[in-house]
Amino acid sequence: MITVAVPNKGRLHEPALKLLERAGIGVEEPLGRRLKARTTDPDIEVMFVRAADIPRLVEEGVAQLGITGYDLIVEAGAEVKELLDLRFGRARLVLAVPEESDVKSPEDLDGGTVATEFPNIARQYFEDVGVDVEIIQVSGATEIMPRIGVADAIVDLCSTGTTLKVNRLRVVDELLETSARLIANPDATDGEVIRRVYLSLKGVLNADGKCLVMMNVPRERLEEFHELLPGVTGPTVSEIYGDEDMVEVYAVVNEEDVSEVVLRAKELGAEGIIVLPIERMIP
């Protein structure tokens, strides 16, 4: 049995559960305030905790796997093994100041104050650029700190930029890009189960935005279809019993290319075209 730590709330909670479900690991929401929940896989349970606590819990072996943001992994400084970029929860950690501020670069903040929920990252950043600032740790509403006179600048997450605009803030610099990651305890002993989770999630990510296109095509035009359907390692070709003139061809195609591929395939004489969604794809 392994434990997967998942954010109990916030922007990573729902996407994490949906991704696990797509990977065949359906999660039962815990009753009341229960910390853990069973899954559809008898070898896996889920622990619901604060996203910021997950790196440490995985490092200490309380959970063997975890899903949390890269920003929180860096902030915690935890010794964990990063297995996958899960491609959701994308954002930037930025240094921002009020629009009317004279600050144009980090150096202009020398001797000033910076509010943030990421004191370790911010402190290291300013040390690296050789700027002396006072770091003020906050636990939320970072964007209002300059307006109420608490800080000259902030270091905060920015996904769409809307919050910065609403609070009349502008970006001075970008500290890092973040997204949700699958992390593991380096000393975890349940290697087979961990690898199963890894391959299932990777298969879902590989299948995102792709379809399987199948069709019967004239044998004499097979080379043209090879160019039309490159696939992952080239299209797969199968014989059709009792038909010497046609062969079956199928390949993985990007969703945005499907309409064009189908149209071109019809022009080349394809018949019986089928487009199927792909749940998982493991090379």
From Swiss-Prot:
**What's known about how it's activated or inhibited?**
Feedback inhibited by histidine.
Role noted for this protein: Catalyzes the condensation of ATP and 5-phosphoribose 1-diphosphate to form N'-(5'-phosphoribosyl)-ATP (PR-ATP). Has a crucial role in the pathway because the rate of histidine biosynthesis seems to be controlled primarily by regulation of HisG enzymatic activity.
What pathway or pathways are given for this protein in its record? Amino-acid biosynthesis; L-histidine biosynthesis; L-histidine from 5-phospho-alpha-D-ribose 1-diphosphate: step 1/9
State which Enzyme Commission number(s) the record gives. 2.4.2.17
- Keyword Zinc-finger among record annotations: no
Q: Which NCBIfam families match?
A: hisG, HisG_C-term
The identity of this protein, by name, is ATP phosphoribosyltransferase
Q: Where in the cell is it found?
A: Cytoplasm
Cofactor list: Mg(2+)
Can you supply a Gene Ontology BP term from the record?
L-histidine biosynthetic process
Q: Which PROSITE patterns match?
A: ATP_P_PHORIBOSYLTR
A Gene Ontology CC term for this entry?
A: cytoplasm
Swiss-Prot/TrEMBL catalytic activity = 1-(5-phospho-beta-D-ribosyl)-ATP + diphosphate = 5-phospho-alpha-D-ribose 1-diphosphate + ATP
Record organism: Methanopyrus kandleri (strain AV19 / DSM 6324 / JCM 9639 / NBRC 100938)
- What's a single GO MF annotation on this record? magnesium ion binding
What does the sequence similarity comment in the record state about its family?
Belongs to the ATP phosphoribosyltransferase family. Long subfamily.
PANTHER family given for it? ATP PHOSPHORIBOSYLTRANSFERASE, ATP PHOSPHORIBOSYLTRANSFERASE ATP-PRTASE
Name the predominant localization: cytoplasm
Q: Which UniProt keywords apply?
A: Amino-acid biosynthesis, ATP-binding, Cytoplasm, Glycosyltransferase, Histidine biosynthesis, Magnesium, Metal-binding, Nucleotide-binding, Transferase
